[in-house]
Amino acid sequence: MDTDFPVSLSPAFLKVTRVRGQACPRVCAPNLPRSVTPSTSGRWATRAARSALHVVPAAGTAPAPPPPRALRPAPGPPRSAPLAPPLRRVVQSLGSSRGSRASCCSPSCLHGDSASQARGSEPSSSAERGWPSWSGLRGNSLAGRPEGWASGTPRLSKHPQRSLVPEFCIPEIPSNYLDKTEVVKAPKSRQNGRLLLCDPKEKLMSGSNKEKPQKSSFGRRPRLSSKLCTSPTQIPGGATVFSARKETSSKKIEDKVSLKSSENRPSSRSIETNRQFDLWSSSFLKESSGEVNKDLVLAKQEKNSEYCLEDIEENLSDSTDGDGEEDSNNEDDEGPAKKETRAPLELMAEFLRAEMGRDYQLAKKLCQMILIYEPENPVAKEFFSLIEEILLKEKAQEEEEEEESDEDSSSESEVDSSEDGSEDSSDECEDGS
């Protein structure tokens, strides 16, 4: 049983088809259960739209002849064919019925009494509509089934089921679309980089770590690396702290330099001793050239050595008076300080020259001065003992030479006296004869 739905036609359509305005057009849609929802896509939808529309004139009006290309004749009865052809026919009719329902879903589109008739003719349930059951449709499909098909449920379309209500697909907009389109702003609590403090006069720069570009839902959009550039006027606190630290560090450096300079400064006595050594070296050079006598040089050296010994004794007495109350730990600490005092290089050079020139008297005095600077120097002690032995040997040799010279002189005097006595006796003999 077919259900008729009244459709309102536009005036342009009436002009083209030459149908009177009193005609009540109706669209015939075939009966179909709710469970069968074949898809109307592709050329089948257009073919259904063309073949399903046909005008049924109302009673009391003369039918108008249709134009040659406006409408096509209604299709004939279904053939006894396999399951696929009736399903296609159903698809075509469904496409036409969907289009007609979409166009006349509201009651304002209907004309007068046709709207009330359509409302009154709508059944309240599927049983009143007179739609065939699923078993009936199954029997019709099995009657026209070919021989090769197996028994069972009818094959429906492979497309997913769709409802008869038109659906509108609205694309989903991601929630972070606006955030991605705008410039990425780093939060305040986040550290963009390390603050590099320079001189307070210069600008303070902070280089932020460049972030890697990340993929967004709409393509590649690299994040902007934020760089902060602030002048020293904007950060007075940091500049003051930096200047205070700089002042304290400069003061510490100045104190260290002053201490080092005071430690490295030679004392007045050491300067005097250096001058004395210079005089000795010059006198030694003059002596080697033959300009000055040895006696004068030795006298000057003895005087200078006496002054040096007096100064050293005074220093030792002062240190012993102060160190008498101190512990042994302080003495251990002072030990390396005493060891650090070394004899000047000029004194060592003069000593070596005297030793090579075999001037053992001068070498002995220079060795004594070296021992004054370095009393625990083993090399100086060995040289001093060797020089003393050499001097003793020289003294012994000189004494032996003097004795030999005395003996020679005495023997010579005795020989002279004997010669004189023999001459006197010979003279007396000659006189007696």
Swiss-Prot record:
InterPro entries: ERICH2 (IPR026703). Residues 63-85 have a biased composition (Pro residues). Residues 199-214, 244-258 have a biased composition (Basic and acidic residues). It comes from the Eukaryota. Residues 56-86, 113-161, 189-273, 308-344, 394-433 are annotated as: Disordered. Residues 114-127, 259-273 have a biased composition (Polar residues). Residues 308-334, 397-433 have a biased composition (Acidic residues). This is Glutamate-rich protein 2. It comes from Rattus norvegicus (Rat). The gene is Erich2.
